[in-house]
Amino acid sequence: MKDLARQRYDEACAHDRAGREAEAILCYEEALSLGLPDVRRRQALLGLGSSYRNVLRHVDAIALLRDAVAEYPDDAALQVFLALALWSGSREREAMQALARVTLESADLRGHGRAAQHYFNHLD
């Protein structure tokens, strides 16, 4: 079972790199349903969410990536791809808020974190 999940994951990545999003989506979904180790699971969730976004399935991308961020709150890449999906889904304010969170949590702002937080809180 795990070997098949890994095989489907590898196929998904190959399709993704080749720009064959529809095929990638099917393989990512199957790999995830079969069960992947934690590191591969994170990568598959990111790849699937990104592929959903690329085929304009913004609602699916946002839902999947929100769940992924809830499952892996320390994963900055998932947070960034959630922000991209939100932006593509015409939810620009939420996208900026998501980017603000990941920026404030992971970037070296050289002592300007409080100021950046203030400005992010007052974007309007």
Language-model region placement:
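Alpha-helical adaptor scaffolds
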Residues: D10-E71
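Conserved positions within tetratricopeptide repeat
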Residues: I25, I62, R93-A100, G113-Q117
